[in-house]
UniProtKB/Swiss-Prot annotation:
Active site, UniProt feature: C78 (nucleophile), E766 (proton donor), E1044 (proton acceptor)
Gene Ontology terms: biological process: carbohydrate metabolic process
Job of this protein: Bifunctional enzyme containing sulfatase and alpha-L-rhamnosidase activities involved in ulvan degradation. Ulvan is the main polysaccharide component of the Ulvales (green seaweed) cell wall. It is composed of disaccharide building blocks comprising 3-sulfated rhamnose (Rha3S) linked to D-glucuronic acid (GlcA), L-iduronic acid (IduA), or D-xylose (Xyl). The sulfatase specifically desulfates L-rhamnose at the 3-position and can act on the motif Rha3S-Xyl-Rha3S in an exolytic mode of action, producing Rha-Xyl-Rha3S.
Segments of this protein annotated with the region Alpha-L-rhamnosidase: 569-1174
Record-given protein name: Bifunctional sulfatase/alpha-L-rhamnosidase
Enzyme nomenclature, EC number: 3.1.6.-, 3.2.1.40
Organism: Formosa agariphila (strain DSM 15362 / KCTC 12365 / LMG 23005 / KMM 3901 / M-2Alg 35-1)
Length: 1174
C-alpha cells in the first residue's frame, strides 16, 4: 500500500512538473501564424496606398506591427518561392520547380515546420503547400494540403470544399480550418505554429472567367471603373525579348487584360479575392482574442510573389521587374507593440529565419536568409544587406529563365539562356523600370560591377547539388583544347554526370563559334535543346558538318534523376582537323615529362645518373664549357654487377645501350644527346615512325657522363620522356600483398611508358603493331586510364596492315568488342563490320563449324588486307616463341603444343569471334546475320567439345588427330566459356598442373580463364608469384617496364619494354576485382570480386562515365567488408561466388540470396559478407 501511494505521488509530481514546465515554455515562446497569399503583389494592399483594394485587417496589422515596403521574393514563381520559404534557401540551392520531383530530403529535414515541431511546437498547416514532398507528417501535427481543383474549368476550381455540407470558397475553407485549429489548440500547453496558405488571389487559369470571389466581397468596386495599367503602350511590350513576347506572360495577358472588359473583370476579381482573405484574417484575430492568446501570437502576412496587372501588356509573374518580385510583408508581434515602416530590402527567406528566431530555435547553418526579429523589436536599424540575388531558373519553353541583382539604387538582370540580353535600371530615379541603361557608356562600370556581384552571389548560393557535368570529351578525347585536331566533322561528345545528380534524365548541349558566345549560353553552331535522354557518352553532334581548321567551344548541362536542372559545365575548346590517311579516329596529344635524377653520383669523374624508371626518352643537360672538348655519354636500360651502365647487354637481346659523343663549347649551355636511330625499328613501311617533331628516342633508365671538365649537378640533367596523354590519378591499386602491389605498379607504368609512338607497338626491337600485342595493351590501357584514342587508331591501322599469325587476325574482333564495351561507341563497328567478318575467319569453316588456316589462299589473304604479292602464308602461332627459338635450346612457350589442321586454340578464338559478330550484327540491325553468327558459334562450341575433348581424361587435346594436351588447348576454352560445367573441375585441375607454361601473352587468357571459373586463389598465386616465370622476376632482374618474355633465357632477343607483358594491369581490375562493363559504355557495371587470400585491397578503375572506387577488408574468418563508390549515371551489379550459408548485407539491409546480385546506384555503398550472422 505504501509502495502504491509512493507511485501515485511520483506520477502526480511528474505530471505537475511537466505541466508547469510546458506552461513556462508556452509563456516564453509565442504562438506563430504565418499567412501566405498567392500572387499578391506589393501594392495590392490598402496600407501601401492602394485606394481600390479593401484590406482593413491587413492594414491594421501593418499599422500595429512592422510593415516592410521593400519585401522581395528571391524567385517570382509560387512553387519555387514556397520551396524557399520552407527550406530557407534560394531557388538556386533547393532547385525545385513545377517539373521536378520532391524537394530534396536534405533540405526538408531543415524545413522550419519540422524544426519547430522537433523543438516543442505544435504545428499545423492548411492550404496550398505548393511543393512536392511526401512526408508532411514529419512537419505537421495536423494538416490538410489542397489547392484549386484543376479538374474543373469553371468556378468549381475554387468551390469544391465543404463546411457543414455547404460548398464554400477555398478562402473561406482555409479560414475556417485556421479558426478550428486555434479553437482546439490555443489552450494547449504547447505553443503552436500555424502555416496558412491561401490559393487566392491566384487566377483559375483553366477557366474563361479566370477570377472567382465570394459573395461577401461581390459588392466591392461594383460602381468603379479601375484605371488602366501603367506602361500599357505597345512599345513597352515590344521592348521585351522575343522569348517573353512569345511566352506565357503575353498569353495570360490575352486571357485577362487584352480588352477593357476583361481587364475590369480580372482586376476587380483580383482585389475582391484579396479582400476575401482579409475577412478571414479578421475572423482569425477575433478567435485569438476569444481564446485569450492574441497577446502572445505573432502574425506574419506575406505574398508568395508579385504579379503583372497588365503593365507592359503582360500578365503573370516570373520576370525580374519589381511588379513581379515585390510583395507585401507584415510582421505583427503584439509583445513589441511598436509600429514601424521599414524600407530596407528584405527577402522571403528572411521570414524562415525570423520564424525560427521567434521560436527560440537555432537556425540551420544552411539557411541563407537573415532574421528580421532584431528589426521588428527595434534592436537594430539595419540587417546590413546591400545587394540581393533574384532569379527565376525554371527552364520552361514558355517562360525564359532569368537572374539578377538588386540594390537600393540599381537593378541588373539577364536571361539565362542568352546572357547577352541584359537590362539595367536606376530604380531610385526610375522606379517603374522604363529606361534600360545597359550598353550606355556612362553606365558600363555599374553594369560590370553588378555582373560581378551577380556571379559572386550565384557562387555563394550554389551548393554541391548545382554542380554541372565534368570531364568533358570530344571524340573520347579529354582536354582537346591544344595540340589536338578532331578528325570527325560531326563529333561525339561525352561528360561525367556529377555524383550529386545521381542519374541524368535529359541534357542540353551547346556548340558555339567563340568563347564569348558560349559564355553567354548561346549555341550559334548547334543547340540540341532539351533532349530527354540518359545518354552521357557518344552524344552525336546534330548540326551541319563542322569546318576543317575552325575552332569551336561546347558545354552541356543536364537534368538530374528528379528532373532538376543543374549548372552548365565549363566550356571546352576544340579544333577540327583533317586526317592524312584513312584512319578517322582522332589522335590525342603527346606529353613530355621532364624527369630529374632519383640518384646522381660522381664516381671518380664519371657522373652516374639513375632516373628511377626507364622511359622512351632522350636526355638534355646544362653544361658550361670553358674550352671546346668532348663528353662521352652512355645511356641504357641495364646496369652491370658493379652498378654502372651495362655496356654489354646479353648477346642477341634487344636490351638497349648506346655510347654517344657530345661536343661542347663555350657560349652554349644546353645540350641534347644525339641518340642513334636503329635500322630495324625505323624500317620504312614496316616500323611505325615517331610522331612528327619527336627527336630520336631510346628506352633507358641509366646514364653516365664522362670527360666533364666543369662540374655538373643533379639539377642540370633531365630525362625527356615521351608518351601519350596520361592521367596518373585515373587508376590505383593497393593490397596487403607487397609483391602484388609492385607487380601492379610495374604493369601500370609499362602501359604509360610504351605509348610513345602513336600506335600500340610491340616494343623497341621492331616498333611494329601486332594484333595480339595490341589487344593486351588495349585492355590494360582501358583499365589504367580513361584513354581510348591510341587503341582505336591501332584498330583502324590493322584493317590495312594485318600480320601473319592466324590468331592475330582473330584478335581484331576482340579489340573492337573491348572498345565497344568500354566506350559504348559503335563508329568503328559500323565502319569496319564487313572487313571484320573476313578477319573472324568464318569463311574457313567446315560443315561441322570448325575452321582451319589450311584453307587460306591468296584471294582470302587479300580479303584480310594483305597486299598483292604478300608471300608469308597465314600461320597458326598458339603462343610465342616456339621451341629452340633463335638458336636457343629452350622448350618454347607452347607447352609442347602439337599443331593440327583443326586445332583447339584457333577454334576457341573462332567461337568467341562468332559471339562477337552476332552482337555486332544485332547493333547494326542485320537480323539474318545475327542468326547466322549465333548458329556458327553454337556449332563451333559443339564441335570443339565433341571432337577436341578427351572424355576419359576430362581435358582438351591440341587438335583433331593428336592426343597431346597442352595448357593452351585448355586455358583458351576456359577463357572463352567453351567448357561445359560438368567438365570445369577436370580442365581446371589440368590447367593448374601445368603452372605458367605459357608466355607473358598467354598469361592473359590463362588468368581470364581462371577468374571465369572462380579460381581466385590460384590466379592470385600466379599474379604474386616470385618464381622465374613471374612478373616479379622482371622487377628482380632490374626492369621498370614489363619484358617481352619471362626472362632472357626464354627469348634471347627480347626487349625490356613490351606492353604485352603488362597483363596484371588489366587482370587485377577485371579479374581479381571483377570490375567490367556489363553493358556497353558501362551503363551497367559488373563487380564480382575474387580476393582469394588477400586481407585488404583498394582500387580505382576508370570508366567512360567516371571512376569506380572500391575497398575490401577481410575482418576475420566470419566477416568481410566491401566499400564501393559508383559514379553518376551508372548502375552496377555486385556479386560474389559461393555465398551459400552467408549473409550479404547492403547498407545495413540483408539482401535475399535469391537475388544473386546487389544492385548499386550512384554513390557509396557498404556491403558486408557475414557467416552465420544469426
Amino acid at each position: 500500500m505504501i509502495k502504491y501511494k509512493a507511485i501515485i505521488n511520483l506520477v502526480f509530481i511528474a505530471v505537475f512538473f511537466n505541466n508547469a514546465m510546458s506552461q513556462t515554455v508556452k509563456k516564453e515562446k509565442p504562438n506563430i501564424i504565418f499567412i501566405l497569399t498567392d500572387d499578391q503583389r506589393f501594392d495590392a494592399i490598402g496600407y501601401a496606398g492602394n485606394k481600390f483594394v479593401n484590406t482593413p485587417e491587413m492594414d491594421k496589422l501593418a499599422q500595429q506591427g512592422t510593415y516592410f515596403d521593400h519585401a522581395i521574393v528571391t524567385t517570382p514563381i509560387c512553387a519555387a518561392s514556397r520551396a524557399s520559404l520552407w527550406t530557407g534557401l534560394h531557388e538556386r540551392s533547393h532547385n525545385f520547380n513545377f517539373q521536378t520531383g520532391n524537394v530534396r530530403e536534405e533540405y526538408m529535414n531543415n524545413a522550419y515546420p519540422k524544426l519547430l515541431k522537433n523543438n516543442g511546437y505544435y504545428t499545423g498547416f492548411y492550404g496550398k503547400y505548393g511543393v512536392r514532398y511526401d512526408n508532411l507528417e514529419s512537419q505537421f501535427d495536423e494538416f490538410e494540403s489542397y489547392d484549386r481543383n484543376n479538374r474543373y474549368k469553371d468556378k468549381r476550381g475554387y468551390y469544391y470544399k465543404t463546411i457543414n455540407n455547404d460548398t464554400v470558397h477555398l478562402t473561406r475553407y482555409t479560414g475556417q480550418q485556421a479558426i478550428d485549429f486555434i479553437d482546439k489548440n490555443a489552450t494547449n500547453t504547447q505553443p503552436f505554429m500555424l502555416s496558412l496558405s491561401f490559393s487566392a488571389p491566384h487566377a483559375h487559369d483553366g477557366a474563361p472567367e479566370q477570377y472567382f470571389w465570394q459573395t461577401t466581397t461581390d459588392a466591392l468596386l461594383q460602381d468603379t471603373t479601375l484605371p488602366g495599367p501603367d506602361l500599357a503602350d505597345e512599345k513597352y511590350f515590344l521592348a521585351q525579348p522575343q522569348a517573353v513576347r512569345d511566352g506565357f506572360n503575353r498569353l495570360r495577358w490575352t486571357w485577362r487584360y487584352d480588352d477593357p472588359e476583361k481587364y475590369q473583370h480580372s482586376l476587380k476579381g483580383y482585389y475582391r479575392m484579396i479582400s476575401g482573405i482579409d475577412l478571414e484574417i479578421k475572423k482569425i484575430r477575433d478567435k485569438l482574442k476569444e481564446k485569450g492568446v492574441d497577446k502572445n501570437t505573432v502574425i506574419i502576412v506575406m505574398g508568395d510573389n508579385g504579379y503583372f496587372l497588365g503593365e507592359r501588356q503582360l500578365a503573370g509573374k516570373w520576370l525580374m521587374y519589381d511588379n513581379s518580385i515585390r510583395v507585401p510583408l507584415i510582421v505583427f508581434d503584439p509583445r513589441v507593440n511598436k509600429h514601424q515602416d521599414i524600407s530596407e530590402m528584405v527577402l522571403n527567406i528572411d521570414v524562415t529565419q525570423t520564424i525560427a528566431d521567434l521560436a527560440g530555435v537555432k537556425a540551420p547553418e544552411s539557411w541563407q536568409g537573415k532574421s528580421l526579429l532584431p528589426l521588428v523589436k527595434q534592436e537594430t536599424s539595419t540587417i546590413s544587406r546591400d545587394t540581393i540575388l533574384i532569379e527565376h531558373l525554371w527552364d520552361f519553353e514558355n517562360i525564359p529563365p532569368s537572374e539578377g541583382v538588386r540594390t537600393e539604387e540599381w537593378k541588373y538582370f539577364r536571361y539565362v539562356n542568352d546572357k547577352t540580353i541584359e537590362e539595367l535600371y536606376n530604380i531610385k530615379k526610375d522606379p517603374k523600370e522604363i529606361n534600360n541603361l545597359i550598353g550606355k557608356k556612362k553606365y558600363q562600370n555599374v553594369a560590370k560591377a553588378l555582373r560581378e556581384k551577380l556571379d559572386e552571389l550565384i557562387a555563394k548560393n550554389s551548393d554541391e547539388f548545382r554542380a554541372g557535368p565534368s570531364d568533358l570529351t570530344v571524340e573520347l578525347i579529354r582536354q582537346p583544347e591544344s595540340e589536338v585536331k578532331i578528325f570527325d566533322l560531326k563529333p561525339e561528345f561525352g561528360w561525367t554526370v556529377p555524383l550529386s545528380s545521381k542519374y541524368q534524365s535529359a541534357y542540353q548541349l551547346l556548340v558555339a563559334s567563340s568563347e564569348t558566345i558560349i559564355n553567354a549560353n548561346n549555341g550559334d553552331v548547334w543547340d540540341s535543346g532539351q533532349v530527354r535522354s540518359s545518354q552521357s557518352t557518344n552524344v552525336d553532334f546534330g548540326g551541319k558538318p563542322l569546318k576543317i581548321g575552325e575552332t569551336y567551344y561546347w558545354k552541356v548541362r543536364i537534368w538530374d534523376e528528379e528532373n532538376r536542372l543543374v549548372d552548365y559545365s565549363k566550356a571546352q575548346k576544340f579544333t577540327i582537323g583533317e586526317s592524312d590517311n584513312y584512319i578517322i579516329s582522332t589522335e590525342n596529344k603527346f606529353v613530355t615529362d621532364k624527369i630529374k635524377p632519383s640518384k646522381f653520383e660522381n664516381r671518380d669523374g664519371v657522373y652516374f645518373i639513375d632516373f628511377g624508371k626507364a622511359a622512351f626518352a632522350t636526355m638534355e643537360f646544362n653544361y658550361q664549357a670553358k674550352t671546346p672538348h668532348t663528353l662521352t655519354i652512355r645511356v641504357g636500360e641495364m646496369i652491370d654487377e658493379n652498378g654502372n651502365v651495362n655496356r654489354t647487354p646479353p648477346a642477341k637481346s634487344n636490351i638497349r645501350y648506346q655510347e654517344l659523343k657530345v661536343e661542347v663549347k663555350p657560349g652554349q649551355t644546353r645540350y641534347r644527346i644525339p641518340i642513334q636511330t636503329d635500322e630495324r625499328n625505323t624500317r620504312p613501311n614496316k616500323a611505325i615512325p615517331l610522331p612528327k617533331g619527336f627527336p630520336p628516342l631510346l628506352p633507358f633508365r641509366y646514364a653516365e657522363i664522362e670527360g666533364a671538365q666543369s662540374s655538373i649537378n643533379a639539377n642540370d640533367v633531365e630525362q625527356l620522356a615521351y608518351h601519350t596523354f596520361w592521367d596518373e590519378k585515373a587508376s590505383s591499386f593497393k593490397s596487403d600483398n607487397n609483391i602484388l602491389n609492385q607487380v601492379w605498379d610495374l604493369s601500370k607504368y609499362s602501359i604509360k611508358a610504351t605509348t610513345f609512338n602513336g600506335l600500340y607497338v610491340d616494343g623497341d626491337r621492331e616498333r611494329i603493331p601486332y594484333e595480339a600485342d595490341a589487344y593486351l595493351n588495349q585492355l590494360s590501357h582501358y583499365t589504367t586510364d580513361r584513354e581510348y584514342a591510341m587503341a582505336r587508331r591501332t584498330i583502324e591501322y590493322f584493317m590495312k596492315n594485318p600480320t601473319w599469325p592466324t590468331e592475330w587476325q582473330q584478335h581484331v574482333a576482340l579489340l573492337l568488342y573491348a572498345d565497344y564495351m568500354y566506350t559504348g561507341n559503335t563508329e568503328l563497328v559500323e565502319r569496319y563490320y564487313e572487313a571484320l567478318k573476313h578477319k573472324s575467319l568464318y569463311e574457313l569453316s567446315n560443315e561441322d563449324g570448325l575452321i582451319t588456316s589450311t584453307k587460306v589462299d591468296a584471294e582470302f589473304m587479300k580479303k584480310l588486307g594483305f597486299p598483292e604479292g604478300y608471300k608469308k602464308p597465314l600461320t597458326d602461332i598458339v603462343d610465342w616463341p616456339g621451341a629452340n627459338f633463335n638458336g636457343s635450346k629452350t622448350p618454347g612457350e607452347r607447352d609442347g603444343f602439337v599443331f593440327q589442321p583443326y586445332n583447339t586454340v584457333i577454334n576457341s578464338f573462332f567461337y568467341e569471334n562468332m559471339k562477337i559478330m552476332a552482337q555486332f550484327a544485332k547493333i547494326l540491325g542485320k537480323t539474318d546475320e545475327v542468326l547466322d553468327f549465333e548458329l556458327r558459334a553454337a556449332k563451333a562450341k559443339k564441335a570443339v567439345n565433341e571432337q577436341m575433348f578427351d572424355k576419359k581424361r576430362g581435358i582438351y587435346v591440341d587438335g583433331i588427330g593428336t592426343d597431346h594436351a597442352s595448357l593452351h588447348a585448355n586455358m583458351m576454352p576456359l577463357a572463352f566459356g567453351l567448357v561445359p560445367q560438368e567438365h570445369v573441375d577436370t580442365v581446371v585441375e589440368f590447367v593448374k598442373s601445368r603452372g605458367m607454361a605459357c608466355s607473358v601473352y598467354g598469361a592473359q587468357f590463362l588468368l581470364d580463364g581462371l577468374y571465369n571459373v572462380g579460381e581466385a586463389d590460384y590466379a592470385l598465386d600466379l599474379l604474386a608469384s616470385t618464381s622465374e616465370r613471374s612478373w616479379y622476376n622482371m622487377i628482380r632482374i632490374g626492369s621498370t617496364i614489363t619484358l617481352e618474355a619471362w626472362d632472357n633465357k626464354y627469348k634471347n632477343n627480347l626487349d625490356w619494354n613490351h606492353a604485352w607483358g603488362a597483363v596484371p594491369a588489366n587482370a587485377i581490375p577485371r579479374g581479381l576485382w571483377g570490375i567490367k562493363p556489363k553493358t556497353a559504355g558501362f551503363g551497367i557495371a559488373s563487380i564480382k570480386p575474387q580476393m582469394g587470400k588477400l586481407k585488404s585491397s583498394q582500387i580505382t578503375v576508370p570508366t567512360v562515365r567516371g571512376a569506380i572506387h572500391a575497398t575490401f577488408t577481410h575482418n576475420g574468418p566470419r566477416s568481410q567488408t566491401y566499400e564501393i563508390e559508383i559514379p553518376g549515371n551508372m548502375v552496377a551489379e555486385f556479386s560474389l561466388d559461393d555465398i551459400d550459408g552467408k549473409d550479404l548485407i547492403h547498407n545495413g539491409q540483408k539482401v535475399p540470396a535469391a537475388f544473386g546480385a546487389v544492385q548499386l546506384s550512384p554513390g557509396k555503398h557498404i556491403i558486408e559478407l557475414k557467416i552465420n550472422s544469426f
